[in-house]
Every structure is written in structure tokens, then in C-alpha cells.
A protein has these predicted regions:
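Conserved beta-sheet core of the metallophosphoesterase superfamily
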Residues: 107, 134-145, 150, 158-224
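Short coil/turn segments at secondary-structure boundaries
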Residues: 24-27, 72-74, 177
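Active-site metal-binding loops of divalent metal-dependent hydrolases
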Residues: 15-17, 63-66, 120-122, 168-169, ...
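Short acidic, Gly/Ser-rich segments with clustered Asp/Glu that frequently serve as metal-coordination loops
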Residues: 17-24
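Core catalytic region of metal-dependent phosphoesterases/phosphodiesterases
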Residues: 4-14, 30-144
């Protein structure tokens, strides 16, 4: 979690309710720790943003937030078994409360918030259901907008900046600038272009490709 290079826009992401035991990995990680680290990260971003003339926030949600997509067996959408902490239904309620908490915190500092949902391969169904639930919860908030469509790549224009996000399990990195130029008419109207991915769940160094900078978000898990 970090502010992107345009000083007036901040994307934020919480992902991966996966399980990590200290006797296996050397560090404990569970759903409570994931929530705590996420809230600490949001607080840290808000502190770092203090003093900047920020008039717009972008919050990225989705991206394997549920980690699994079945109520039993701990399996992803395609059936891959995962290590999880707690029940599937617990995950949904925890993620819902966390998203609501984050959004309410952000708009208390900066009143203009755009929430972007990126569908993902671990929780293609329940991730969307969660995003739709959050959008419904804030449906009467005039200063919060949502994009919860199932498009694989989302784009947002902020002055002369074109900001894209995608989960990252589809098109290869070197193709993303070409897809952005083909799919988004604002390509020719903007000077600075960014694409953020999430699939690898850890930070990858910035890559400056033709006409676009690409970066991957990390998750709160110990390995990241």
C-alpha cells in the first residue's frame, strides 16, 4: 500500500486472507493480523499524505480478497485447495466490515473517493458479491463512486494522468500498455499513464514500458 506517483491520487488495496503458521514459515499470520496490518497501512498512508493537496482518492478492492470461492473445502474458483484461517462466511463478514471501515475513514479525510473493483482468479464469484455489497451499502453517498463491472482492466482519468488497474492473472505485463492504448480513448489525451497489478501478491519493481509505467501491489502477508 502506497501513494502512486501522481501526488493527488492514492490507490489502496487489501488482499489475501490466507493462513501462515510460525512453525512453518517462521511468522504467524491470520485473519486478525491481516486486518490489523491493513488498518495500520491505511493510517500510514493518510499520515504520509498529510500536507499534499489531494482532491481525489482511488481505492482498489477485490484482487483475491476472499482467497477462496467455496463455502467448504477451501478451494479457489477453479478448485485449487488453499490454506485458510477460519470459515468462508467469517472471511466475508470480516472483509465487508474492513472495507466499510476503510471507506468511512478515507472519506472523513478526503471527501472524493472512487472505488474500483478488480475481479480475480481465486474468488471470481464471491469477490464480486462482496464488491456489490459494499457498493449497495454506500449507494446514497454522493461523494463515493464505484466501478464494480467485470471488465478485466479498469481505467480512470485524472487530469493528464491515465490510471489503470487489473488483477494481473491474464495479459502479460508487456502487453498491458498496448491493451491500454487500444481499449481506452483517453490514451491520446493523457501524458502520464500507469497500470497497477495485484496477482503476484508481492512488490515487483517498476517497469517503464512504451508509454506506460507498471507496478504490482503487495499484500499484508509476511512473505510480501
Amino acid at each position: 500500500m502506497f501513494p502512486i506517483t501522481t501526488p493527488s491520487t492514492i490507490p489502496i488495496k487489501w488482499t489475501n486472507n490466507s493462513l501462515c503458521k510460525s512453525f512453518v514459515s517462521g511468522e504467524e499470520y491470520n485473519k486478525q493480523i491481516a486486518v490489523q496490518r491493513t488498518l495500520e497501512a491505511v493510517d500510514g498512508i493518510l499520515q504520509k499524505s498529510n500536507g499534499f493537496n489531494i482532491d481525489k482518492l482511488i481505492l482498489c478492492i477485490g484482487n483475491d480478497v476472499m482467497h477462496i470461492d467455496t463455502p467448504s473445502g477451501g478451494k479457489t474458483t477453479k478448485g485449487t485447495v488453499q490454506d485458510v484461517d477460519g470459515m468462508f462466511f467469517e472471511h466475508f463478514h470480516i472483509a465487508k466490515r474492513l472495507y466499510i471501515n476503510i471507506i468511512e475513514t478515507l472519506v472523513s479525510f478526503y471527501p472524493d473517493l472512487h472505488v474500483v473493483y478488480n475481479s480475480s482468479n481465486h474468488d471470481y464469484l464471491t469477490g464480486f458479491c462482496l464488491a456489490d455489497t459494499i457498493a449497495t451499502y454506500f449507494r446514497n453517498s454522493k461523494n463515493i463512486t464505484f466501478d464494480i463491472s467485470l471488465q478485466h482492466r479498469k481505467y480512470y482519468t485524472y487530469y493528464n494522468n491515465l490510471i489503470g488497474s487489473t488483477h494481473g492473472d491474464g495479459a502479460k505485463w508487456d502487453l498491458l500498455p498496448l491493451l491500454m492504448a487500444d481499449e481506452c480513448k483517453e490514451w491520446s489525451e493523457t501524458k502520464y499513464r500507469y497500470m497497477f497489478t495485484h496477482h503476484v501478491h508481492h512488490k515487483i519493481g517498476n517497469k517503464d514500458l512504451i508509454g506506460c509505467s507498471i507496478e504490482s501491489f503487495r499484500s499484508p502477508s509476511p512473505a510480501d
